[in-house]
Amino acid sequence: MNKSLQEIDKLFKKRKYNQVIKKTKKLVNSKEVIPPFYNLLGLSLAKIGKDQESEICFIEGIKKFPNEISLKSNIALIQLNLKKLKEAEKSINDALKINDKDVYTLYALGNLKRDQFKFREAIDNFKKVCEINVRFPKALMYLGQSYLDLAQETNDKQFYILAEKNLFLSSELFPENTPVDYTLSTLLNYSENNIHQKKMLDKINKLTMNDEQKYFIYFALGKSFEDQKKFEQSFQFIKLANESKNKLVDKDIIKSEILRSRNVKKIFDNIQTKISNSKLLFQKKIIFIIGLPRSGTTLLHQILASANNTYGFGESIIFTKFFENNIFNKSFLSKILERKTFEDHIVNISNEIGGKYESITDKNIFIDKMPSNFYWVGFIKLLFPNSKIIHISRNIKDNCLSIYKNMFGARDMDWSYSESNIFKFVMNYRDMMSYWKDKYQNEIYEIKYEDLVLNKEEETKKLFNFCDMDWNEKIFDFYKNVKTIRTVSVNQVKKPIYTSSIDSSSNYTKFFQHLNRLED
């Protein structure tokens, strides 16, 4: 093996991604360049959250080495992270033309099919990978998760059994692959069976794990002891999980959240809030459900999405990604703040974003439950004249406990692994919502989670009236809906409305520091 490659490969395995990036950036522009340098550079950029730079890196590599299949399969995974499904599909098809039995390409294809909600095809591809190479931990894990997706979609117990079987097999064959244990913990009730809990405890005593492996299994153990109502042990593992995860995240994330709020306020302190001809804007109704994560957005989404002629997008990135990418962009800001270009720009954005929703479904009512859309209320009102905004809130201590004890995959949730950061985020969120309520008081529908679950008929009738939708009691069968929603706790999506999470924080308040300072 090339000496430089050996050295960089060791750094990559030690997770020293910034050092890998520094070295490979020089090597890809040298005469010594070989495809693995592009792979290591692109994958390292992705590991530190720079997916767009990673994609550019792989594009450059493919131009130099058009027949290198590893570059094509790797760029496909990055494009899936960026939700560029068409581009990912093209990259995969190009790779399959080179070798239709390449395990990494088949693995990427399985992930594409999952993202397309084609779970049976995903299962077929992950099976192929496992048959070709039985030592492929992620393929077996995603085979189990695809069966879980299919179980949610069909409500067929057979697929839940197959999901558990493959996830348990993955945990046994690859004990170091602890994300499997976390997925299993969302499926199992440890008050009924503690075999997996014992295996996890045995695993943490026997294996030497890095922080990335630790936080998955610690979150899983926290959940297992909570099922058994052993709250002190549960909190010990929840705290360990958050401490392990928090070591790996951006330390300035709260500064970024506050800066985003300031920028949005500056814009709406100076911007026009309407255009002269609203008929030029996207006309279909989009219902935005906003609030803190774990506040009940999923429950609201499932209820509304069970009505006729609606399509639930879940936590869609369509709207929020556009503004996250542009809120600090000087060109974007100048166009919306300049009176001459304002109207044309707003019309273009409205129809561009609306068109992305519309390309997925022919239904007339769209539902987007991305909680962090609370940052963009002003843009929602400006861009979509027929939109509805629903703000759901929950007992703040229950809400924050639920945030603290759960693991979120998205990088924009990295603030959630520290009590102090959760407290600061809540303060920023409240400040942002107060700003919007002053501007759009009668256009934001307020609903409390506790009222919704305790008085479901009365509250949903008022909710549907606000949304100009027809109500009927069949909406309470939402949990039988075949629509698959990916959320933190997969077992909650397929349950009817329940009240057991009210006052759940009372079991943990004595262990908290910062969060006890929060009041409703």
Named regions from a protein language model:
Residues 12, 46, 73, 80, ...:
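Position-specific recognition of the canonical hydrophobic site in helix A of tetratricopeptide repeat
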Residues 164-166, 170, 182-185, 197-208, ...:
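PAPS-dependent sulfotransferases, especially Golgi type II membrane carbohydrate sulfotransferases
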Residues 279-384, 392:
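Phosphate-binding active sites in nucleotide-utilizing proteins
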Residues 30, 64-65, 98, 132, ...:
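Structural marker of alpha-solenoid helical repeat scaffolds
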